[in-house]
Amino acid sequence: MAQGDPGGQTPQAPQGTDKKPDEPKATEKPQGAGPQPRDPPGGEKGLRDPPGGEKGPRDPGQGGAGEALAEALYGLGRPVLRAVLYLFPVYLCGRFGLSPTWLLFGLFLWMFWTRNKKFKLARIQAAWDLHENEKLGVTRGLYLQQLPAWVNFPDVERVEWLNKVVGQMWPYIGMYVEKMFQDKVEPLVRSSSAHLKAFTFTKVHLGEKFPRINGVKSYTKNVDKREVILDLQLSYNGDVEINVEVKKMCKAGVKGVQLHGTLRVILAPLLPDLPFVGAVTMFFIQRPHLDINWTGLTNVLEIPGVSDFSDSMIVDMIASHLVLPNRFTVPLSSQVQAAQLRFPLPHGVLRLHLIEAEDLIPKDNYLKGIIRGKSDPYAVLRIGNQNFKSRTIKENLNPKWGEMYEFVVHEVPGQDLEVDLYDEDPDKDDFLGSLVIGLEGVMQDRVVDEWFPLSDVPSGSVHLRLEWLSLLPKSEKLSEAKGGISTAMLIVYLDSASALPRNHFEYSSSEYTTRKQRHMTYTKTDKDPNSYVLMSVGKKSVKSKTCTGSTEPVWGQAFAFFIQDVHMQHLHLEVKDSERQCALGMLDLPLHRLLGNEELTADQRFPLANSGPNSTIKMKIVLRVLHVEAPEPESIYTGINSLKQGPVSIKRAQSQQHKSHGKSHQAHHQAHQTQQNHTVQQPKAERKESISTTSQQANTSSSNPAPNQNPNSTGAVPESHTPSLKPLERIAPSLLSLNSIGSSVFDPNDKRWPSEMTGEVEVSVRYASLRRCLVVLINSCRNLIQCSSNGADPYVRIYLLPDRKWSGRKKTSVKRKTLNPQYNERFEFLVSQEEAKKRMLDVAVKNNRGFGSHERKELGKVLVDLSCDDLVKGFTKWFELTPTGLPTS
């Protein structure tokens, strides 16, 4: 390549042109120059426009007639060629006497191929548009799955500065990858097969679009203080173009790749010396999404069915190295052992009891829904790459399964339980609902037995019992085996083997050799074996990767087995040669031997039977007892179980303002209590308090009764908590209009409104980390305004402000002819915990009046500020109802 002129002259050979196999490699660059310009992905090679976008001068007399003739011939020949291509398959069918079915099959195949190709190009183009202008894509409104993570999740931070750094480095990364493909990958492919001697990369171009990190989430709670955990929302919508050629007529390539996933980066252990981090560990929590646009002969991979198979094969290759439980570890210090970081012990085991479901939607309808049938439901349960499918219950909308499954949980937080329900059909299974449960809350509560409502469907819920099993190195915690339930877990870290025989002729075991030679004949050879390990415990068998051409193989893999009976089960291991299918060594280890070892662990070299005299295999075998531990006292009922213990009583403040309020309210309450004492149930404030506050609050209430309150009264009213205008301004300026909204609904000057408060509503609020949603429980109301001679027909309406859309409206059932209704109804708002703290609940109590009735409609409302309380712990309070929702004082 000619050296570039410092004066800015045009180089003789433009950069980025396709490389021919016989062309020399150009490695020299102008001193101090940056990355050389490349051809655009779809541009013509060797042609460049002058600076400023102006075209060069053209002589109108040169080639004008020739170009016009060429355009005319092209316009006539293109329709003719298209007609010939369309009719040629018809001619072939008639020429060879094939059935017209083959023609129809080819037509449908071509239609599906073009449809799949069009959709894939549309997805890539949409991703490129979002890459070019992310702000425009967010403001104009895209689907949630297309938006960056920082838009949907407030706890995910936007790191645009990091994307700018990657974008600045991307051309140089492209140069390195291009050189690596040509200098390393190409010779390896050529040497792998005699048919690939002419294999050549004709073009390697990573494109202009670089991988982006849409957000970073850091974990600071419930994690080890000696590590830093980051989740990177990785998104690559690349215009990469790679073309290969084996022979002149055999060309293939890739033009456009999409890769999306959550990459977890762990910096651990933290050290007091440089470089302060012992190692960097990276892995994908879930299998990433991959979409490849093939070109050339590989276009056949775009055929429906084949495309899914090819993409899944590539994802499987990525998963074997970078998806849990596999990890990629880069040691940064000699003080740490990389093997311990690559294969840490699992966090625990989740035992899931799939009990039943109810109120599922019917999918087997007939005559376009005129005749409604039922469904044949089954459940698919998933944590990471572990999948289980339940049995199918025929024609039942309230199926009962009664099945149990066990999952190995490697990362918490990070991994979630996914439950999908489907209706089994001969052609395509119909969707019945889904459910995602975060495992952090299960790990805190230890045992969760709950009905979970299904998402994305009008109705349906599933009953699950979740048990978190800790891994304990204590043999005394070992329980008896019963009912197929696992009592322990065996983790095997397969390291390496040494002094393996090349074949079965090198060791003397006449019985084993004679048994094998009855069915096979081996050829004695001095070639080193391609060895792999086959391990089994009970009915489960696993196979390691194959190490080629070595008598000292190194596998470096980990496997886990569930153990039902430690005293009866064995670990059986066999080293085999994949090429000759002969055994190179065996090991049988009774598991009860591990019970006498320290921490139930054996880390040593085990001698192999039926092998060479010095053949050994190095493994670390860890036995852990599965046990449900009691929850920690400070975390009792902080997960999904927190609302099961009823409301927590709140101590009233000893202020003069509350005293005067208590006097006026007590008189009003006693007047209603004498009238309705025989019909009103005991208020929910009298229910059993939570375990964590029972003793303390019982002693406080018995020794220091609140003033103006009868200790024997059942209608004690805790302090009402209502928001002030100051937090209202902090949440959002748009919420300042709530006062005007309330004024338009309620008329404060209406003489029908009493001067004191107009009743109370009891609300329980908690953020469910399992469901990642805000749970609001409307318990009851009391002392409501009488709207007619029969009392009122009250119901409660809820908004999560500032959202006042009809779709976000929640409403309880109507209670007839009562001023003290009991609801006990639960509602959920899908919102993150950080976002929930910025919101406010609008709870209004209304009277269900008939059409044309002149009865009162609004009974009062309250605005609940969610930023003042710990939402994870939750709270239950009585709130006074006012016309505007603001406090009366």
UniProtKB/Swiss-Prot annotation:
Matching InterPro entries: C2_dom (IPR000008), C2_domain_sf (IPR035892), C2C_KIAA1228 (IPR037752), Ext_Synaptotagmin_C2A (IPR037733), Ext_Synaptotagmin_C2B (IPR037749), Extended_Synaptotagmin (IPR051634), SMP_LBD (IPR031468), Synaptotagmin_SMP (IPR039010)
Region feature (Disordered): 1-65, 649-724
Entry keywords, A to Z: Calcium, Cell membrane, Endoplasmic reticulum, Lipid transport, Lipid-binding, Membrane, Metal-binding, Repeat, Transmembrane, Transmembrane helix, Transport
GO MF entry, a single one: metal ion binding
Ligand binding (Ca(2+) 1): 363-364, 423, 425, 430
Binding residues for Ca(2+) 2: 364, 376, 423-425
Ranges of Basic residues composition bias in the record: 658-671
Major site of localization recorded for this protein: membrane
Parts of the chain that traverse the membrane: 67-91, 92-112
Protein purpose: Tethers the endoplasmic reticulum to the cell membrane and promotes the formation of appositions between the endoplasmic reticulum and the cell membrane. Binds glycerophospholipids in a barrel-like domain and may play a role in cellular lipid transport.
Descriptive protein name: Extended synaptotagmin-3
Provenance organism: Xenopus tropicalis
UniProt gene name: esyt3
